[in-house]
UniProtKB/Swiss-Prot annotation:
Functions as an E3-type small ubiquitin-like modifier (SUMO) ligase, stabilizing the interaction between UBE2I and the substrate, and as a SUMO-tethering factor. Plays a crucial role as a transcriptional coregulation in various cellular pathways, including the STAT pathway, the p53 pathway and the steroid hormone signaling pathway. The effects of this transcriptional coregulation, transactivation or silencing may vary depending upon the biological context and PIAS2 isoform studied. However, it seems to be mostly involved in gene silencing. Keywords: DNA-binding, Isopeptide bond, Metal-binding, Nucleus, Phosphoprotein, Transcription, Transcription regulation, Transferase, Ubl conjugation, Ubl conjugation pathway, Zinc, Zinc-finger. GO terms for cellular component: nuclear body; nuclear speck; nucleoplasm; nucleus; PML body. Binds SUMO1 and UBE2I. Interacts with AXIN1, JUN, MDM2, PARK7, TP53 and TP73 isoform alpha, but not TP73 isoform beta. Interacts with STAT4 following IL12 and IFN-alpha stimulation of T-cells. Interacts also with GTF2I, GTF2IRD1, IKFZ1, DAB2 and MSX2, as well as with several steroid receptors, including ESR1, ESR2, NR3C1, PGR, AR, and with NCOA2. Sumoylation of a target protein seems to enhance the interaction. Binds to sumoylated ELK1. Interacts with PLAG1. Binds DNA, such as CDKN1A promoter, in a sequence-specific manner. A zinc finger (SP-RING-type) spans 331-412. The gene is Pias2. A motif (LXXLL motif) lies at residues 19-23. It comes from Mus musculus (Mouse). Belongs to the PIAS family. This is E3 SUMO-protein ligase PIAS2. Its EC number is 2.3.2.27. It comes from the Eukaryota. It is an enzyme of class 2 (transferase). Its main location: nucleus.
Length: 621
């Protein structure tokens, strides 16, 4: 009864392919859906199957869930006992199909004749079996001595599954193999402590469970390499693989870039429950692969840079010896190199070097920045030298001491030149080398910059002999002014600058308004308004133009005896006859001059105003 339950559980765990093989071996219909196939297999088991069918069930189950090396040890024992031509009629051993007939699906064994002698069956099938097994390649070892290349950004903490060969278990194209591993409580604790929650509910781990695949070659350390049609399941969940790389040429099959696989998110973080990995792939002739699982700790570029600095800086004499070797004249060559020009700019970031670095395997002197190189490989690990496009692994990187000295000595140079003796000199740009000499220009400190677009500066007669240059760019760019801005001087108009037309207002708008005070000769004032031949017409106040700003409204009122009574004239001429001097009213924005004479009542004031100091507003108050 226990055997029946065990066989029933084995059949229930079969896939469609195993069910079809079992039903075909028993001579039953093997077409249909999985549910139908499973019901037929269980019915076959309940109806009392033969021992050969039971052996076939155990064989299929052992293929699907391989256990240990005990099966292979039993395999060699069974082979030696089965193929011995002793002619004994002993019954078939339970593991016989595993050894002999698993590669021959169509055998001459009759399932319903368990009492038939096995010797005759073996004698009939011995020859063709050996003919088919002769060209088959030898079985690779289960744990080959495969070494994987070290990954600089990962420290290996423990080995969960040693490198194990992906052995072909049948002649079918697509193969599948299962692996089981368990975590210890300490390993589970380290993984949980390193967990970090990211936005979107995602989780990231610094301590990771890493799966690696490579070719089963023992000649040299192997890089990560995936077989064709790879499919990985961890605890029954499909693991997403990296995308395909673009093919280098047309017609070449696309392959995934080889890199380690972080399966931590699908692993059961428990020491009580084991984890199962299912790997299916397409077999290739002449290529065998192996897999391994590690517990690793992920590092950052800053950590690797610190480790690189701890290795120390290479002696500058090594670089000088390399320079002398490159510049040594070759007697067989007609062309000799006398100097080497090297840039101090990083070819990766196009910036000045901070930590000059290069690989020991490189033959050039040009360095690249170590921090940028590590950051680039942290995102996409290629480890290719940006100068010569050759392999530059992390283990071969060095910090150049000579370039360290050069960067510390000159901070404003981007290129240097090495001489034959190993010395160097900076290479400055031609624009800096050619300095244009010119006469110094004197700067007028008393000048100031105003908010107006134009400024007027009036110099004295002594300063007119010199040619002063005002640098408005320097004045405007300076944030702090040492001296306060000088005040503008008032310009007074002389007698010759006054208007030659008597009694006519001259108005010319100007952007600079300078108050002026003019002295008017009393002889220039007309005795009365009757001296003018032009008849005077009274102009109403509403019709006066607004273009006459800054004028005293009383000076515009006509003083004529025929229009105004004597009492009104007396009130108007009383302030004018008080004195014959000029009264000047100035303000920051307007200036006007009122001149009066005390000759008679009919006399009036003549307004003389410069065109530059007339305001724009007439006050009626």
């Amino acid at each position: 009864m226990a055997d029946f339950e065990e066989l029933r559980n084995m059949v229930s765990s079969f896939r469609v392919s195993e069910l079809q093989v079992l039903l075909g071996f028993a001579g039953r219909n093997k077409s249909g859906r999985k549910h139908d196939l499973l019901m037929r297999a269980l019915h076959l088991l309940k109806s009392g199957c033969s021992p050969a069918v039971q052996i076939k069930i155990r064989e299929l189950y052992r293929r699907r869930y391989p256990r240990t090396l005990e099966g292979l040890c039993d395999l060699s024992t069974i082979k030696s006992s089965v193929f011995s031509l002793d002619g004994s009629s002993s019954p078939v051993e339970p593991d016989l199909p595993v050894a002999g007939i698993h590669s021959l699906p169509s055998t001459s064994i009759t399932p319903h004749s368990p009492s038939s002698p096995v010797g005759s069956v073996l004698l009939q099938d011995t020859k063709p079996t050996f003919e088919m097994q002769q060209p088959s390649p030898p079985i690779p070892p289960v744990h080959p001595d495969v070494q994987l290349k070290n990954l600089p950004f990962y420290d290996v903490l423990d080995v969960l599954i040693k490198p194990t060969s992906l052995v072909q278990s049948s002649i079918q194209r697509f193969q599948e193999k299962f692996f089981i591993f368990a975590l210890t409580p300490q390993q589970v604790r380290e993984i949980c402590i390193s967990r970090d929650f990211l936005p979107g509910g995602r989780r990231d781990y610094t301590v990771q469970v890493q799966l690696r695949l490579c070719l089963a070659e023992t000649s040299c350390p192997q890089e990560d390499n995936y077989p064709n049609s790879l499919c990985i399941k961890v605890n029954g969940k499909l693991f997403p693989l990296p995308g395909y790389a673009p093919p280098p040429k047309n017609g070449i099959e696309q392959k995934r870039p080889g890199r380690p696989l972080n399966i931590t998110s699908l692993v059961r973080l428990s020491s009580a429950v084991p984890n199962q990995i299912s790997i299916s792939w397409a077999s290739e002739i002449g290529k065998n692969y192996s897999m391994s699982v590690y517990l690793v700790r992920q590092l950052t570029s800053a950590m690797l840079l610190q480790r690189l600095k701890m290795k120390g800086i290479r002696n500058p004499d090594h670089s000088r010896a390399l320079i002398k070797e490159k510049l040594t004249a070759d007697p067989d060559s007609e062309i000799a190199t006398t100097s080497l020009r090297v840039s101090l700019m990083c070819p990766l970031g196009k910036m000045r070097l901070t930590i000059p670095c290069r690989a020991v395997t490189c033959t050039h002197l040009q360095c690249f920045d170590a921090a940028l190189y590590l950051q680039m490989n942290e995102k996409k690990p290629t480890w290719i030298c940006p100068v010569c496009d050759k392999k530059a692994a992390y283990e071969s990187l060095i910090l150049d001491g000579l370039f360290m000295e050069i960067l510390n000595d000159c901070s404003d140079v981007d290129e240097i030149k090495f001489q034959e003796d190993g010395s160097w000199c900076p290479m400055r740009p031609k624009k800096e080398a050619m300095k244009v000499t010119s006469q110094p220009c004197t700067k007028v400190e008393s000048s100031s910059v105003f908010s107006k677009p134009c400024s007027v500066t009036v110099a004295s007669d002594a300063s007119k002999k010199k040619i002063d240059v005002i640098d408005l760019t320097i004045e405007s760019s300076s944030d702090e002014e040492e001296d306060p801005p000088a005040k503008r001087k008032c310009i007074f108009m002389s007698e010759t600058q006054s208007s030659p037309t008597k009694g006519v207002l001259m108005y010319q708008p100007s952007s600079v308004r300078v108050p002026s005070v003019t002295s008017v000769d009393p002889a220039a004032i007309p005795p009365s308004l009757t001296d003018y031949s032009v008849p005077f017409h009274h102009t109403p106040v509403s019709s006066m133009s607004s273009d006459l700003p800054g004028l005293d409204f009383l000076s515009l009122i006509p003083v004529d005896p025929q229009y105004c009574p004597p009492m009104f004239l007396d009130s108007l001429t009383s302030p004018l006859t008080a004195s014959s001097t000029s009264v000047t009213t100035t303000s920051p924005h307007e200036s006007s001059t009122h001149v009066s004479s005390s000759s008679s009542r009919s006399e009036t004031g003549v307004i003389t105003s410069s065109g530059r100091n007339i305001p724009d507003i007439i006050s009626l108050d």
